[in-house]
A protein has these predicted regions:
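Extracytoplasmic/secreted envelope proteins and their assembly/folding machinery
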Residues: 64-67, 74, 78-81, 121, ...
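Solvent-exposed, acidic/flexible segments
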Residues: 71-74, 117, 135-138, 159-166, ...
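Bacterial Sec-exported substrate-binding components of ABC uptake systems
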Residues: 4-7, 20-76, 180-208
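Extracytoplasmic substrate-binding proteins
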Residues: 141-213
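A short, structured surface patch at a secondary-structure boundary
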Residues: 69-123
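Extracytoplasmic
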Residues: 44, 56-58, 65-68, 75, ...
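Binding-cleft/active-site segments that stabilize strongly anionic ligands or cofactors
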Residues: 102-157, 205, 211-212, 217-286
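Bacterial Sec-type N-terminal signal peptides, specifically the leucine/valine-rich hydrophobic h-region
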Residues: 14-17
Length: 286
């Protein structure tokens, strides 16, 4: 009897443990399923961001969240996407590029979509992007590209400032992938660096120039080099001139007459691989 009682008790204990194990397993499995469902509910399929339309007006644009297929026809956007670590999602890029982004041009898996000035619409369509990034040079193609996929058109605003504009654009792009914290980390020191440069620039005059097609152009505070006169604070001696694109051509005599303490030059020819840069250096690089 005692042996039988022990056997029965052992059997009951075993059954109890098995039942507990099954209950715990069921609970764990149920919890995992619930967590996955909750994550799916929390991760949206689409989000809305602030972008520009063909006229450069700010609009609310619906884009896919965490897109897997991206077409890029803007170097600034490509730079941001590359820095965010989502370059593997790029299925097509402009043939126009910078040396440190050339992997996206030389990569056989990335389709050639034309240039940052003229998109190959057929090539864009063939790579089946979920979203397309463009810059100002392709604003005229905005509507045609929008028929293929949502078009994210971002730019810099001189009034806002180059650094703040770039940061804002990076935050916008990052929000499409849930990578906002990455942008905060990468831009954390921008303001401090600008403050240091601004202190050095106080009371000093400068000319801001660009070599392009063999000529030397002077830039105002409304162009792509506005960071020097607006945010850093050098007294740009041609600040009032309207020079939003490539600036106004200037002679060597003009530079001498202005007599700046500093001259900042952006070599556009070298940046885009044009041959004309040699002449610009010969004439103004002494």
């Amino acid at each position: 009897m005692r042996k039988l009682a022990k056997v029965l008790l052992a059997g009951v204990a075993a059954l109890s443990l098995t039942a507990c194990g099954q209950a715990e397993g069921t609970t764990g499995s149920s919890a995992d399923t619930t967590a996955k469902e909750q994550k799916q509910q929390e991760t949206p399929e689409k989000i809305k961001i602030q972008s520009l339309n063909a006229n450069g007006e700010e609009i609310s644009l619906e884009v896919p969240y965490d897109p897997e297929r991206i077409a890029v026809l803007d170097m600034a956007a490509l730079d941001i996407l590359d820095n965010l670590g989502v370059g593997d999602k790029i299925v097509g890029s402009a043939s126009t590029s910078l040396e440190y982004l050339s992997d996206y041009v030389d990569n056989e898996k990335v389709a050639n979509l034309g240039t940052i000035k003229e998109a190959d619409l057929e090539a864009v369509m063939e790579c089946e992007p979920e979203v397309i990034f463009i810059g100002g040079r392709l604003a005229s193609s905005y509507d045609a590209l929008s028929e293929i996929a949502p078009v994210v058109y971002l730019s810099t605003d001189v009034e806002t400032g180059v650094v703040k504009s770039v940061t804002k654009n990076a935050e916008t792009i990052a929000s499409m992938f849930g990578l906002e914290d990455e942008v905060k980390e990468k831009t954390a020191g921008f303001d401090e660096r600008i403050e240091v440069l601004a202190e050095k620039a106080k009371g000093h005059t400068a000319l801001v120039g660009m070599t392009t097609s063999g000529s030397f152009n002077l830039m105002g505070n409304d162009g792509r080099c506005s960071i020097i006169g607006v945010e850093i604070g050098f007294d740009n001696l041609t600040a009032a001139e309207s020079t939003s694109t490539h600036g106004n051509e200037a002679s060597f005599e003009t530079v001498v007459e202005k007599n700046p303490e500093y001259i900042f030059v952006m070599d556009r020819d070298q940046a885009i691989g044009a041959d004309g840069g040699t002449d610009g250096k010969r004439n103004y690089g002494k």
